[in-house]
Design a protein with these regions (language model features):
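Flexible, glycine/threonine-enriched loop-and-boundary segments that flank and lead into catalytic domains
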Residues: 450-469
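N-terminal secretory signal peptides that target proteins for export/translocation
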Residues: 1-12
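Ordered core of a single globular domain
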Residues: 397-404, 477
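A conserved glycine-rich beta-strand in the N-terminal activation segment of trypsin-fold
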Residues: 179-254, 464-549, 554
Length: 595
């Protein structure tokens, strides 16, 4: 898509230097956009297919070096080894050379060029590759003059000055052994703004939009586009990097590949805009939003959207010591719809076989008679064991699915009630597991256990290492677990008992990042680190036994996992689905729990 290796090289170098060195900046005071200086997005047309915008990056990164997660990152053995290696030495030598050339520290120079505002715009073309223009607003009026002079010093160019709309711009072509080579590069300096592109028409468009007189008949600028405004408004204001994409502009590109076009275009036509952003708050947080048409949507998707909007209190009943927890809002119709995605004969045969097996287990059809009783909430947790026992797994898991299992009127058609169907099917699976285990281990047979607690019935197998598989049926939930204690704890948990919702780290992440998202996944990496530290020796022995490895090598692997989890205390992934829009957020953070 980008034709010139030279242009690619300069963009990569500039972006890399900006992202790597800006966290090291100190208090350089940047100039602000004055009233007569245009926004960069006002200098490009609304026909762009992709726009990457970085605003006031220096302010966003100002506090990063003093944050806890960045301090931990610098203290990681991996980072220290890199700092002691040859690549870092080369980087330092190159930085020192550039510092001598530009006459000031490189980090200050990069901040001067890119710390305020940068825009990279890509415009699809009906013939040929897309056109690209890069714009950046520097802190000082002479910044770009020094950059262009340095560029000419490092690489010989033939420079031709041209003019349009009362302003001059340059056509630059690389010279090698006295001969010009490579594609043209066009640059124009507008005060503190520099625009660079391989396409002369894109530079002319920038010049035309910067002219003081209105341009009759010219297409709207990007900042006037309703789609762009709505897409950017869907992102948090704190985003340092923002991306906008217009699906309509890329349809011709998709059609160039007939195979992809046939699969993607029906869905692509429904997309109206896409936006994404990166936020540096508590850590690194990414956001994305997709807006789509609401007409002609399938009924299962509409039910899924409705299910996503229903409230849930599941986090108030999940254990506080979970290292991994999540919840999804699922409409039963969506599960049924999945069967129709693959229309091949093999897929149809497989589904028919699956239906016969489940009907034999449950005494009723899974999709027609069981799933319609499911409620939207489906969640689960992974909880570490303390202490780790030699013959049991180091973690336990619990899966919770909300079901309407209240007793209905007595059936007269001979078909079992839903609760009886689920109980019979799950009990059969437990019995199969017990028979398989006992046939190989007659000395320590697995034994079925049953416990009744009010409206809850729990059944599990003892002596089936490394777990004690269990299921529970209550009036509102179907529960599956690796240990019956998790089912009992879920059933018995009261409002005053410790729960995930009130765990300080989860509460901070939830309130700051995912409160409006009904689908979420949460990793308590701080608890995982503590578990790996406390149970390091028994974990090493256990994993070494299972994987038939030497304990020292397993110990080193666990140390690397713990190191990987060091910078951030939590990670999360969440989605919010509303009519016409889907939003995602994901991040790794170390929140200050004192705030």
């Amino acid at each position: 898509m980008i034709r010139s290796p030279s242009f690619r090289r300069y963009i990569v170098r500039w972006m890399f230097a900006m992202l790597v060195t800006c966290p090291l900046l100190s208090g350089l005071c940047l100039a602000r956009v004055s009233a007569d200086e245009p926004e960069l997005t006002s200098l490009i047309g609304e026909d762009v297919g992709l726009c990457v915008e970085i605003r006031d990056l220096r302010s966003h990164l100002r506090d990063v070096p003093s944050t806890e997660w960045f301090r931990r990152l610098r203290e990681m053995p991996l980072v220290k080894r890199w700092q002691q290696g040859p690549e870092f030495a080369k980087w330092q030598a190159g930085q020192a050379t550039l510092t001598l050339l530009i006459g000031q520290p490189l980090d200050q120079f990069v901040s001067e060029l890119f710390g305020e505002s940068v825009v990279l715009a890509v415009s699809p073309s009906k013939s040929g590759p897309p056109g690209i223009v890069l714009l950046s607003r520097a802190a000082k009026d002479d910044s770009w003059d020094r950059v262009l002079a340095l560029w000419d010093q490092l690489e010989a160019h033939e420079v031709q000055t041209k003019s349009a709309f009362g302003r001059s711009f340059q056509r630059r072509q690389k010279k090698t052994n006295g001969e010009t080579s490579g594609p043209d590069l066009f640059t124009v300096k507008l005060g503190r703004i520099l625009a660079i592109s391989e396409r002369e028409e894109l530079i002319l468009d920038v010049l035309a939009r910067s002219a003081s007189a209105p341009n009759e008949g010219r297409a709207k600028s990007l900042d006037q586009s309703p789609a762009y405004r709505h897409a950017i408004a869907a992102l948090p204001e704190q985003c340092a990097v923002r991306v906008f994409a217009d699906p309509r502009r890329w349809e011709e590109e998709l059609r160039k590949d007939p195979a992809s076009a046939e699969r993607l275009l029906p869905l692509w036509h429904k997309l109206e805009w896409f936006s994404a952003g990166v936020e540096l708050r508590d850590g690194i947080v990414g956001h994305a939003a997709v807006h789509h048409e609401t007409s002609g949507l399938s009924a299962p998707w509409q039910r899924f959207v409705e299910a996503s909007a229903t409230p849930s209190d599941l986090a108030t009943r999940l254990p506080a010591d979970a290292v991994l927890a999540g919840e999804a809002r699922i409409a039963p119709e969506l599960l049924n719809w999945l069967r129709t995605l693959d229309e091949s004969e093999k897929a149809k045969t497989d589904w028919q076989t699956f239906g016969k097996v489940t009907r034999g287990l449950l005494g009723r059809d899974l999709f027609d008679d069981v799933l319609p009783h499911a409620r939207p909430s489906l969640g689960g947790v992974v909880v570490p064991k303390r202490p780790v026992e030699e013959q049991s797994a180091p973690v336990d898991g619990l899966l919770v699915w909300q079901f309407d299992l209240s007793h209905g009127p007595t059936r007269t058609d001979g078909q079992p009630e839903l609760r009886e169907s689920l109980d019979g099917g799950l009990l059969t699976l437990l019995n199969f597991a017990a028979v398989a285990h006992n046939s190989r281990n007659p000395v320590a047979p697995a034994t079925l256990r049953v416990e009744h607690r009010d409206t809850l019935t729990i059944k599990w197998l003892d002596s089936l290492p490394p777990y004690r598989p269990a299921f529970g049926l209550g009036s509102e939930h179907l529960l599956l677990a690796t240990d019956p204690r998790l089912i009992s704890a879920f059933h018995d948990r009261k409002a005053a008992d410790p729960a995930l919702k009130s765990e300080p780290l989860f509460a901070a992440v939830h309130s700051r990042h995912i409160a409006e998202h009904s689908h979420w996944l949460f990793l308590n990496s701080r608890a995982a680190r503590e578990f790996l530290t406390e149970q390091h020796e028994p974990l090493s022995r256990q994993v070494a036994h299972w994987r038939k490895l030497a304990p020292p090598s397993v110990s080193a692997q666990l140390d690397r996992v713990r190191e990987f989890l060091t910078p951030f205390d939590a990670a999360f992934l969440a989605a919010r689905i509303t009519p016409g829009e889907v939003r995602f957020t994901a991040g790794a953070v170390t929140p200050d729990l004192r705030k």
